[in-house]
Amino acid sequence: KIGINILVITNNSQVFSEYYPENVITMNFEHWRESIENIRKWSERYDLKAVIGVDEESIILAAKLSESLCIEHNSLESVKLTKNKYLMRRELKKSGLKSPWFKRFSIDEKPKDIFTELRFPCVLKPTFLSASQGVLRVNSFKDFVKGFELLSDLLTEMKVKKRGGDQVKWILVEEYIPGKEVSIEGIVNEGKLKDLAIFDKPEPLEGPIFQETILITPSILDEHLQFSLLETAQTALKALGIRKGPVHIELRINDKGNYILECAARSIGGLCSKVLEFKGAMSLEELILRSALGRNIEKTQLIDKVVGVMMMPIEKSGILKEIQGIKEALAMKGITDLQTTIKPGEILEPLPKGDRYLGFLFAEGKNQDSVKTVLQEAWSKIVIVFEEI
């Protein structure tokens, strides 16, 4: 559609690599230098202009490849800041943004030895995981001990250790921030944030786990507050050194001000981006590509309608047998799509240890209440058939 050649760099074999072998390179992300010459040759042939990480696992690699190939990108240091919640908190505090109290503890610490350093309620979280994995609110020292042990166990699991490197040795403890939660989707160009959407999260996220479910845009917050949120986001991006590419920023709002929860140098996760439709029949992914190529996206606007997405939660552990009620949910007025992301036979693991959703429900309506209601009603028709482990 936009007349470009794409090279897919993946750590998993892709079905279409059989049909487009010149456009797919499969590699071990940890040993990327072994494949750099193949990428360089492709670049010489097709004039590689940008390297884009599409998820949490690939954004560091994108920065490394860009640096090696002398392609404009966020610095490796700045991307690493977004991937380490402790370092991010430290930088945001230095910038003068509102910050909760926070402290990092080794998983080898004994809770009784750090009791005097704690204030309740507080939140425990790994420094590197996403999708609310391992994030727990605790209201007492008894809860803290249980939560600390749970996270210590999670951080010693092999697949988690492989992702986290040295960060698996640490648990971040920070003040629980009450208030309404929102997220901002945007693209940064030369350090300036172009906001694409502000998502409201109409269901309260108060713990003990933080299961995100419904996102709705456009926001119904007043314009002054929305402007304030964008100012906070811009300050955070400057503090972290993010100057280019897609960003996904999460914030809490209360009577004390705006607090950054997350600032990721990537677009929104999962299939959530499907809910965003821009004038000119453009998707979020197309906008990201256009911006990466230096094309002007400043006048881009969302199509004027109220839309929402529900990340269908995993509520119990087991082996998935079947998801029932999909046809009934899709038949509801206002539901525009439903896509599952876990197949029968796969293991279901709920938060706080899990990191996946059953799938995604999409809806549109005349206002936020109608979108929220139809998503909740459609979800009520879904029945998960599973086998206990």
Could you describe each region identified by the protein language model?
Residues 1-78, 109, 341-356, 364-389:
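ATP-binding N-terminal substructure of ATP-dependent carboxylate-amine bond-forming enzymes
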Residues 136, 175, 217-218, 277, ...:
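Short, well-ordered beta-strand elements within core beta-sheets of diverse protein domains
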Residues 136, 146-150, 172-174, 181-202, ...:
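Beta-strand scaffold of nucleotide-dependent catalytic cores
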Residues 94, 111, 289-389:
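Peripheral (often C-terminal) accessory segments that flank ATP-dependent C-N-forming ligase machineries
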Residues 98-101, 121-124, 141-178, 209, ...:
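Conserved ATP-binding module of the ATP-grasp superfamily
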Residues 67-134, 141, 153-160:
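A conserved helix-loop-beta module that forms one wall/lid of the active-site cleft
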Residues 227-249, 255, 264-321:
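Active-site "cap" helix and flanking loop/linker of ATP-utilizing ligase/carboxylase catalytic domains
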Residues 105, 135-140, 187-189, 254:
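Short beta-strand-to-turn element immediately C-terminal to the catalytic PLP-Schiff-base lysine
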